[in-house]
């Protein structure tokens, strides 16, 4: 009976001794390590250390804004980080040289630590990835304007059309110009251009096709014949 009690007491004592030891190991402040202190001061994290990337030492403004940024963020939780940076930059410019001097001294101390720890360090800024150029052309919008030119009486007249229906009307007009009847090409082109511009883009395809299918006006005894027209 006495031996059993001693065994239980010994097991309980071991458990009590292990619990505080585990607590001290878990909650021991990690900032006692000078390397961890330096990593905290320079803003390093596990991802950068895993990639073997050495961060630059903080300058005077970064040393000053480290605490100021935290204060501004607590006072204005809705403020975005970019707005906080602008406000801190303005406040830093308003400080006098005497007010800035302690932060310059701290920055020099951090730079000295950085040189001792990384004597071969060279600053290599990260390059921004350039977007890859695609060789594929984007599809043209249905409302995009396409133009062609027609040579009439040694002058080029632009002819504008929007879609396949307008192209069909343009081809039909070219076929009519190739017939034996004389036509005033310049007046016909100008009237077609005015008609297409006055047509609303909100019209339905059926209405647009009906407008474009209309024959251009003919002028029987006017200036130009078939031999004077040239189509590229």
UniProtKB/Swiss-Prot annotation:
**What is the name listed in the Swiss-Prot or TrEMBL entry for this protein?**
Sex-determining region Y protein
Region of interest (Disordered), ranges: 24-53, 196-215
Question: Self-association or partners: how does it assemble?
Answer: Interacts with CALM, EP300, HDAC3, KPNB1, ZNF208 isoform KRAB-O, PARP1, SLC9A3R2 and WT1. The interaction with EP300 modulates its DNA-binding activity. The interaction with KPNB1 is sensitive to dissociation by Ran in the GTP-bound form. Interaction with PARP1 impaired its DNA-binding activity.
GO BP annotations of the record are:
cell differentiation; male sex determination; sex differentiation
| Annotated CDD domains | HMG-box_SoxA_SRY
Family matches, as Gene3D superfamilies: High mobility group box domain
Similarity comment? Belongs to the SRY family.
For this UniProt entry, what is the primary localization, expressed as one broad class? nucleus
PROSITE patterns documented for this protein: HMG_BOX_2 (PS50118)
Q: Which gene encodes it?
A: SRY
Gene Ontology molecular functions: calmodulin binding; DNA-binding transcription activator activity, RNA polymerase II-specific; RNA polymerase II cis-regulatory region sequence-specific DNA binding
Cystine links in this protein are none
**Which residues form the DNA-binding region?**
54-122
- Top-level division of the source organism's lineage: Eukaryota
Q: Which InterPro entries match?
A: HMG_box_dom, HMG_box_dom_sf, SRY, SRY-related_HMG-box_TF-like
Q: What the protein does?
A: Transcriptional regulator that controls a genetic switch in male development. It is necessary and sufficient for initiating male sex determination by directing the development of supporting cell precursors (pre-Sertoli cells) as Sertoli rather than granulosa cells. Involved in different aspects of gene regulation including promoter activation or repression. Binds to the DNA consensus sequence 5'-[AT]AACAA[AT]-3'. SRY HMG box recognizes DNA by partial intercalation in the minor groove and promotes DNA bending. Also involved in pre-mRNA splicing.
